[in-house]
Amino acid sequence: MDSFNYIHGKYKKNGTGGDRSINPSSHSSSGKNIILCFDGTRENFGPQPFTNILKLYNLLENGDSSEQICYYQPGIGSVGFDAVVDVRRRLTISHLQNLLDSMFAFSLDNHICSAYLFLMKYFEPGDRIYMFGFSRGAFIARVLAGMIERVGLLSKGLEEMVKMAWQIYEKWEYDSQPNELQYTSTLAEEFKKTFSRDYEVKIHFQGLFDSVNSVGILRDRLFPCTQRSNIVEHVRHCVSLDERRGKFKQLCFTPMPYIPKLFSLTYCNHITDQCSPVPTSNALMRDLTPENPLIKYTLKSGAHSISNPSPLIPDNPGRLLSSKSEETTELLLDLNSFLEGNSYARDTECSTRGIEAIFQLQSIQGSGTSSRMTMTPDLIEKWFPGDHSDVGGGWAPDCETEENLSNLTLRWILAEAIKFGVKFKPGAIHDFATKHTSIGSLFADTHDYLSFNSPKKCSLLGVSDNEDGAREDKSGRNERMEDCLKNIKETRLSLKDEKEKVKDAFTLKCGHANKFMRLVWWVLELLPIGIRMENKEGKWQNFHTPNLGRSRYVPEYVSLHWSVYWRIKFDRRYRPDNMPEYVRQLFQDLEGIDLKSNKVSNKYDKQDNSNGSEINGGFFDNEEGQELHMGQKASYFATTYNSRLFDSKYSQLKKKFMDWDSNSWTDIPDDLKIYLQQDESL
């Protein structure tokens, strides 16, 4: 079989035969942008508040199809349009169809195939593909990228073959992306070779808002291996910090294996430990993934308070301990270089593992004995305050600031999109930045579908009530912050155009959720209907455990947006319980703010090992029920490695706090500021 490598701007055929090469860079000057926007479940154009996807689409330049062409797809559960806006809307046939589609995701196949057909029609060599998605729309964008990678992009005129291409890819996905020669992998390979274009189609950029790990509310259509794709060059992913619904668990690119504890609000995550040199149990050998013998590690279940940032651990832990200048990135690159030269170096599982900003991927071209491992360095996942729709949009503006918290994520994605070449209408970004300020969005209401209380309004720490009920100022800077907030609503109202005022007349005021829907969501939280989570092998599987309104699990290595820190500092009511350990410690040390934790403790840290003996309690059971000792070396390394992670993240965040404090916390960060200063035409 044939495989291709990207060398000096050209795709070269490996093996015998002719040269099927193409140089996309030669078309770069004349190539166009192709932008695909996928909205979230039940989200569409209409009287309801716009999501960030619709807001972004409205800002895109779409006048010259030779420069940029744009595509918008309504979300799952929005197959029909209702002109009725009052209570009668709930009794229409289209409403019932949309409700069933949102519950069972019947239209998922059509959504993916429609976007695929759009690319077939308009993509030419040299074009740059951009994808934006929210919620299950983000999931669709990731599945579409995986489909293009596996079966390719069909040549024009083969529209009738799209359904078959989808069925082949779907079967291959549900077989857990096998690499070895078997029916599904060979069929997909031959299909691509026969019908698809003879060059690799890349996705230049993906901007995603809170991608979730289930498609249907009752019928789960999640593929097991959609986390990562080798053909996506740049990924920006906004993740919700405060969403609690079990059917809206995050689907991150970076692996974060954990499982819920039965009838408990805490999680049991997994730590990475060294394997024993000569395993004797067949069950243990299966755990070591023998198809990839170069990576001699496995994930052992353990109650650990800090998730290990990199599952790729060296055989000699002293290497990491001896010199702080040696970074994990260098280790991964060395390992990847070694993997490329070994015929057995293939990961046949869909549980590809990585760390923040570096995810290891595999492109399957040709036979099972040939593989190409790549390291994609441009992945950024940022965690933002608020629930699912506070990140992706959809809530009405709150009454205090006339702003949405979701504008923070939109500002960040807009900034990244500008960086990578997306074209916007002249003046549209400046107009958006003027109407929707960082400070107004920062202190807008947060929401929680599982809370029967009203949305949490911002309560500034600078002003509080004393025992007599009088207002007491604690700091001048917080008083200035409140004065600034008082002017936001008046300014925002003065900047609204007539179209916005008309739309507001049909919008639910202040973003309140329906109490009946809150009750429905709580019923789903109490039922063990199945929640998709990443297990200790990095694979997705169903856990039939009631979610009970658990907060999301947040590993230690994640990247938090600046708005999380500012919101905690200035809003006395915002106290998330799933913060990384270094964040909780820093707020305690510098601000005197106590953040509770929903994470379990590390049993290894509590063991007495002063006499040098092996650590008691470090046991696990294999599949045959045999008790195996993990040993002192593994737990010592995991503890030391996490300690270094804590120190590094703590010092980096402390430096940020010192910079903000040097300006008395009055210089509000703005992700768009630098781009607006550089280009006045935006």
Swiss-Prot record:
Under what name is this protein listed? Uncharacterized protein YEL023C
List the InterPro entries: Tle1-like_cat
Superkingdom per UniProt: Eukaryota
Q: What is the lineage of its organism?
A: Eukaryota, Fungi, Dikarya, Ascomycota, Saccharomycotina
